[in-house]
C-alpha cells in the first residue's frame, strides 16, 4: 500500500494559482480584442516583457504573425537589451513556418536598418542574422560594415570577423 503525498499549504496555493492563471490565459485568448491587447502591451515598455512571454508561449495564426513579427523584429534589433532574448526566441520559433513570415518581414525592414548608420543597430542585426542563419542578409550587412567610413561601424565588422569568427 502506498501513501498519498502530503503537500504543504504553500504548494497547494501555487498549484491553484497556476490553474487559475491557465484558465485566465485561455479566457483572454478567446476575447474579441485579444490581438489589440497584445499589440498595446508590446508597445508599452512596462508590459512588453509579459507580452513577449505570451507570444513565445502561444500559437498564433499566420495573419496574426504578419502583424506581430515586424514589432518583434524591431524589439530584437533596437529594443531594450533585457528583452532581446525573448524577441529572438520568438523569431527563431517562427522562422521556419510554411509562409516564411520572419524572413519576408526582416528582408522588407532590412534596408531601413542599413540606412540607420547606427553601430548599435548593426551589432544587434548581425547577431540576429547569425542566430536565424540568414546568410544572404548577413553578407550584405558585413559588406556595409566593412566599407563604412564610420569607425564604429567598421568595428562591428571587425568584431564579427576577427573576434567571433563569423563570416
Model-derived regions: residue spans:
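Structural detector for internal amphipathic alpha-helices that build alpha-solenoid repeat scaffolds
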Residues: 12-27, 49-62, 85-98, 120-132, ...
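Helix-adjacent hinge/juxtasegments
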Residues: 67-95
Amino acid at each position: 500500500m502506498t501513501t498519498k503525498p502530503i503537500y504543504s499549504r504553500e504548494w497547494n496555493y501555487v498549484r491553484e494559482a497556476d490553474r487559475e492563471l491557465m484558465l485566465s490565459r485561455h479566457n483572454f485568448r478567446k476575447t474579441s480584442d485579444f490581438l489589440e491587447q497584445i499589440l498595446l502591451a508590446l508597445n508599452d515598455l512596462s508590459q512588453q516583457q509579459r507580452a513577449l512571454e505570451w507570444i513565445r508561449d502561444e500559437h498564433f495564426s499566420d495573419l496574426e504573425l504578419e502583424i506581430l513579427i515586424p514589432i518583434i523584429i524591431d524589439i530584437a534589433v533596437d529594443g531594450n537589451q533585457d528583452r532581446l532574448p525573448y524577441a529572438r526566441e520568438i523569431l527563431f520559433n517562427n522562422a521556419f513556418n510554411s509562409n516564411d513570415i520572419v524572413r519576408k518581414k526582416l528582408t522588407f525592414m532590412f534596408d531601413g536598418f542599413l540606412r540607420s548608420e547606427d553601430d548599435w543597430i548593426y551589432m544587434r542585426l548581425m547577431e540576429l542574422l547569425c542566430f536565424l542563419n540568414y546568410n544572404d542578409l548577413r553578407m550584405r550587412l558585413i559588406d556595409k560594415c566593412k566599407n563604412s567610413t564610420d569607425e564604429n561601424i567598421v568595428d562591428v565588422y571587425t568584431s564579427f570577423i576577427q573576434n567571433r569568427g563569423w563570416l
